[in-house]
Amino acid sequence: LKASCQLLACGEFTIFEYRGMSTINEAQTVELFPELRTDLELLSLGTYFAQVAEVLSQEDDPNPALLSLTLNALYALGKLRKPQGLVKAVFELRAACLAGYTPDLEGCRSCGNPEPDRFDLEGGCLECAHCRSGDGTFVAVTPGILAAMRHVAACPASRLFSFCLGEETLRAFGSLT
C-alpha cells in the first residue's frame, strides 16, 4: 500500500465503501517515476503537474485524457529526459485545451491568414501584421512556434512529446503558456 500512495506514483486502488466511509482494500503500483525523486527541479515540476491535474479534476468524474497527459508528462521528464521547459509548456497548453480553453490556431482572427505573426494571450487567437487591432496582450509567434502549438493542441496523446524545438524557439514557446 505504501508504494502506491507515494508522491508522483501511479497506482490502481480497490476501494470499499460502507456507511459513507471509504477504505482502501488493495493497491497495485503501476509506475513510480523514481528519476523524478533524485532531482529537486524535476520533483517540483512533477508536483506542479499533479497539482494542476488535481485542480482540473472533478471528484467522481473520471478524466482519462487528463490522467494520460499527466502520466505522459512525468514519463517525458523522468524516462525520456525531455527538456523541462518543453514538457512544462506542452503540459500547460494541452491541459488548457482539456479544460476547454483551446486556442484558435486556424489562422488570423480577422483575415484567416494561416501563418499570422502574433498570438493574443487574452483572446486565445492569432493575428497577422495587416490586421493588428492593438487590443489584447500579444506575443510574437514564428512558424516553428505556431507548428508546435498546433501539434500540441490537436495531436493524439501518444504523439504529444514527439517533437523538439531549438533553445530560442523553446523559450518563446514556453512564454505562451
Segments (PLM) and residue ranges:
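Non-catalytic alpha-helical scaffolds and adjoining flexible linkers that form interface surfaces
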Residues: 1-177
